[in-house]
Amino acid sequence: MSGRFVSFRIRPFSYKEILEFCNEINREITPMDYVIWGGFPARFNFNDVESTKLYLEDLENTIIFNDLIKRYNIKKIIAFKKIVSYILMNNSRVYSSRSIHKNIKNQCENISLNTVIKYLEYLKEAYIIDEIPQYSTKAKKELSYYCKIYNADVCFNSLRVNNNRYDIDHNLENIVYNELLYMGYNVKLYDNAGKEIDFIATKNNKVFLIQVAYSVVDEKAYQR
């Protein structure tokens, strides 16, 4: 008789949890630090950016590459790593499996669309990414609408930037999405003829429309 077990998801720390944790260890943290490097608490064992990056890269290699490659017996390791990196650096963006395949096939000539779809499923099953659909009053229509991908932690994006040009806007949107999940909201996207709202969050029969912006200096951002 096989043993019984209960599976539950453990997420990186929310911003509130990071503040509480840093208070306990007498360590200062700024909001921007969290927007860039996220909520894995063990990173605070390191005092400089380079050491923090090395730790997070090692963590990523262990969780994403080593574990998943072994678990799913992935043969096309180079292609898998390129696809994973492409996905993680494009968090908080509209995507489809076809668009990912189109962008990656120049680097991986022998990769098929079905393989890209499989790799996406592996990342979702491992809780590395979340995929959320566009809101629709008709459930069947969700299949034809676009989706967005959000990373379990924004550090997976920041590890891939060049010249310290961190993707603050998309990371901030990613953090808001994760915070909504922590708080128990059901989250979807909304786009009606180009009138986009980042999130429709529902909980206890209440609906909240949420637009995320790092700055509203841009007129289009302000109008939205």
Model-derived features: positions:
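A short helix-turn-beta junction within AAA+ P-loop NTPase domains corresponding to the substrate/partner-engaging
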Residues: 1-16
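A generic structural signal for short hydrophobic patches within well-formed alpha-helices
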Residues: 15-18, 156-157
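Catalytic cores of nucleic-acid endonucleases
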Residues: 190-191, 214-224
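Short, polar/flexible loop-turn hinges at active-site or ligand-entry regions and domain interfaces
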Residues: 17-27, 42-47, 67-74
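Conserved beta3 VAIK motif of the Hanks protein kinase fold
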Residues: 210
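Accessory nucleic acid-recognition modules appended to NTPase machines
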Residues: 48-207
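Generic beta-structure capping elements
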Residues: 10-13, 152-154, 213
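Amphipathic alpha-helical "lid/sensor" segments that cap RecA-like P-loop NTPase cores
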Residues: 24-62
